[in-house]
Swiss-Prot record:
GO terms for cellular component: extracellular region. It comes from the Eukaryota. Potent antimicrobial peptide with activity against bacteria and protozoa. Also has activity against fungi. Probably acts by disturbing membrane functions with its amphipathic structure. The keyword Secreted applies. Belongs to the frog skin active peptide (FSAP) family. Dermaseptin subfamily. It is found in: Secreted. It comes from Phyllomedusa sauvagei (Sauvage's leaf frog). Keywords: Amphibian defense peptide, Antibiotic, Antimicrobial, Fungicide, Secreted. GO terms for biological process: defense response to bacterium; defense response to fungus; killing of cells of another organism. This is Dermaseptin-S5.
């Protein structure tokens, strides 16, 4: 249903944000 779609989207967004954060930290160091 709609809620599971929202949950899935939230998970992928969180994953992308985590990847971006790791990249930013790596570039800073």
């Amino acid at each position: 249903g709609l809620w599971s779609k929202i949950k899935t989207a939230g998970k992928s967004v969180a994953k992308a944000a985590a990847k971006a954060a790791v990249k930013a930290v790596t570039n800073a160091v």
